[in-house]
Amino acid sequence: MTRPASVLAGPKSRPPIHSQGDKTIEYAEKLLSVFILVPFAGSLIAIFFPSDQRGAISWFAGAIALVCFLVTAGLYPYVASGGVLHYRIDWVPELGLNFTLRMDGFAWLFSALITAIGVLVALYARYYMAEEDPVPRFFALFLAFMGSMLGVVLSGNLILLAVFWELTSIVSFLLIGYWHHNAHARDGARMALTITGTGGLAMFVGLIIIGKIVGSYELDAVLASGDAIRNHPLYGTVLVLVLLGALTKSAQFPFHFWLPHAMAAPTPVSAYLHSATMVKAGVFLLVRFWPVMAGTEAWFWIVGLAGLTTLLLGAYFAIFQQDLKGLLAYSTISHLGLITVLLSLGSPLAAVAAVFHIVNHATFKASLFMAAGIIDHESGTRDIRRLGGLFHFMPITATLAMVASAAMAGVPLLNGFLSKEMFFAEAIETHLVNPLDTVTPYVATIAGMFAVTYSLRFIHGVFFGRPPADLPRKPHEPPRWMRAPLDFLVLACLVVGIIPAQTIGPFLHTAVLSVLREGTPDYSLSVWHGWNIPLIMSFVALSGGIGLYFLMRSYLATAVEGPPVFRLLQGQRIFERVLVTLSWKWARWLEQRLGTRRLQPQMRLLVFLALAAGASPLLLGNFELPPLVIRGIDPAFALLWAIGIACAIGSAYQAKFHRLASLVLLGGAGLVTCITFVWLSAPDLAVTQLLVEIVTTVLILLGLRWLPKRIEEPVAAEDISIRVRLRRLRDLLLAIGAGGGMMLIAYTVMTRPLPETIASYFLERAYREGGGTNVVNVILVDFRGFDTLGEIAVLCIVALTVFALLLRFRPQSDSLEAPEQQKVQNAFDDDHPDRAAGDSVAEYLFIPAVIMRWMFPVTGMLAAFLFLRGHDLPGGGFAAGIAMSIGFILQYMSGGTRWVEERLRIHPLRWMSIGLLVATATGVGSWFFGYPFLTSHAQYASLPVVGKFPLASAILFDLGVFSLVLGATVLILIALAHQSVRAPRAHAKAARSDKEAVR
């Protein structure tokens, strides 16, 4: 999108949300945009750190997180009394997609958790990660995940929320699979991405429907439309879709099974993802939409049933885990179920308790994961059956872990006790008269008892009892700074548990006020509320949990991992069976019913479906064909197209047995198309078409070299079976139908009365606003730059896919044989003892090789020429990238793979990534001036000799296109060229090296 140069002189005006005199609020709002971009910028920088600089990169990541935390703390005064900070940039306003950031008290609380625990995890990871681990990749992903989570909690637009939501799924997939050499890590990452990603897509559909109901995707408008959403006929559909996203993210039943398998990630990842970030995103969404979707019976049943089941099963499963991280994973599932139950009740006090427990759980669970990591790091195992008596070896760590475990169990004078008491108090209240409401207090008490049992097992089974005898390493206290995050978190558990009103009270009130607004109830954070039913429930849970542990202690010390009743009912097994059924069994069934693995039946089916889809509306819609009008036809143009049609038909006819001839004819059809563009005054298209024809012809020729040979055997007409004749007739009819249909559609479109088009709009504004006279190029890189960005992203994906497919490809055995001409040349060398194998080849290619090497700088200059003139004359980044790739193709053809790669630094993946980043950064840069994404700036400069010439920021975008197109083409070229390196030489003497064979 383009703005005139005069408009771009100053920042975009926007009606201020606050008084214009309050400059500090305006600065605070602008700070939001910088605040959310800092982690992503840090992620890009972190990846370039050397692998051996573990300390430097950890301090860098910690500094990024600390800066974000300090900014969050500095913004608290603006939201403390119910205020809301906004920062908005129009992105794609036609679709309702704006880059809107919104910080209220609840978003502030989550931002503080994300950044504060991020600082502690960065410090902890400095000592946890091994020297051989790729630490730059870890911290780059860590910072990217921090930025993604901040994007989720600060999103003020539903579409933007969905974008960041899925980004958290993708980055968490990479973090969980960080140790990708481990099969468990790969499986856990795949499971997490599949479940949370699918739930996110369902949530995305629900958010779109909410936007349609409200009439806006802005979160402020949605939060003000609770009655409209709840009373809408699509409320049930929206509720299910949004809850699918929330329940899958927070590992609620029946989607809970992915979380324990995510424990294959490094412990710092577990401490971060499962305390303040990923799994909390689901309950964040429930709290965020609580004012507009809660309070209905459907909400109570769906959310409450999922939460109660998760609360009970998670606690029960945690008791029987033998892996420390597995125990903590299932306890996390249970506590998330507790929060979900609170949010299902529809009571404002329950919502307060839910927000409070989110904070409490983040502190004690992060500390427990860190303690488990220290035990694993210093002893070499996390198996509870092998541990015991560690208090004598690491007393400080043991004391800290015991306090955190007591907080998890809900022991008085710790933060977990306070929110658990609030949970019990709400559980005994009557919300809706139904069986689920009746059983809630009993389930809550039993789950609390189970929580005491698994917490006591963590304490007693690890730190007391018989000392360990066969540990991989002798246990000892960790480095001081590795334990420092644990010290801080446990201290927070103690301080909040003793003086909650003076510590967490103001921040909790700020968060609750932003969610409940005028419905905020009166509540107390006092440690002592007298003798009441919740206190009795706590006493029953504590005493019952202690008794249950000592009854089961001997069994748990030797038992197989997993609960006795549900040991065979494993979510992973069900998940794998579903995947196998969908991706293999059903695929094989469809393959048997619809065709074979051969390409021809598959293409036949695709053409038939396309023909049916295109013909159905024409046949059923009562369309009338336009009258056939034959106007004056230029004989030369008709002859040109007759040649092109003949080439196309000949190429298809010869494709099976005469591939080279078919390729030549295909190039002829492409050349006719190129001439047609010239004929119809489209030189830009003609230049691009010509360059693409050159490159694709050579690449296809390289690919044909490695296909199995096909020899045509003459068959008499009378020997062809009726079945074969019918099959050929069927294919002919399909081809005629599809081709005729396309011809009919083209004729209909071209003979319609020409309505008013947008061509005049582009013609009038291309030079004035885009700074270029080449309207086609200005459209591609300016007016429709967002489309071009998507297209080059697709090109990047295609190139990577081709490279991945050819990476393990090995040619057919019959394609390894040397060509006949090379056989003759090698035989001549064999007959002369004074000649080495390959001398004839080297002599034969010497002159072409020298000429092609001279052509390399020429093609480089041609590419630069096309690139620089593209804004005013035919050319541009795409054509320049193709032209530059021709230079590399010539070098590979003349010098061979090894010769070229020994002399040139060819990094196509780097070129592609730089191109995509430059193109995207060009669009993002416009945000800093208050304009929508990819808004360009154009002005004119004057030099003494050159004179007046245009300068447009779109040239940077075009540079990104050039880099990506060049990288993608060369990557495919390398994938094909490397087949010659992998394939063994048929001639024994020529097998010495590619270098000797072609130089």
Curated annotation (Swiss-Prot):
Gene Ontology BP annotations: potassium ion transport; proton transmembrane transport
InterPro entries: CPA3_Na-H_Antiporter_A, CPA3_sub_B, MnhB, MrpA/MnhA1/PhaAB, MrpA_C/MbhD, MrpA_C/MbhE, ND/Mrp_TM, Proton_antipo_N
GO cellular component terms, A-Z: plasma membrane
TM segment ranges: 31-48, 63-85, 106-128, 138-160, 162-181, 191-213, 233-255, 270-292, 299-321, 336-358, 389-411, 442-464, 488-510, 530-552, 604-621, 636-653, 660-682, 686-708, 729-751, 788-807, 846-868, 878-900, 913-935, 955-977
Annotated signal sequence range: none
Localization, UniProt: Cell membrane
Annotated keywords: Antiport, Cell membrane, Hydrogen ion transport, Ion transport, Membrane, Potassium, Potassium transport, Transmembrane, Transmembrane helix, Transport
Region (Disordered) residue spans: 1-20
Keyword check for Transmembrane: yes
Primary location class: membrane
Membrane topology, record value: Multi-pass membrane protein
Domain of life: Bacteria
GO molecular function, one term: antiporter activity
Family: In the N-terminal section; belongs to the CPA3 antiporters (TC 2.A.63) subunit A family.
Chain's role: Part of a K(+) efflux system which is required for the adaptation of R.meliloti to alkaline pH as well as for the infection process during symbiotic nodule development.
Complex and partners: May form a heterooligomeric complex that consists of six subunits: PhaAB, PhaC, PhaD, PhaE, PhaF and PhaG.
The protein's name in its UniProt record: Probable K(+)/H(+) antiporter subunit A/B
Organism name: Rhizobium meliloti (strain 1021) (Ensifer meliloti)
Encoding gene per record: phaAB
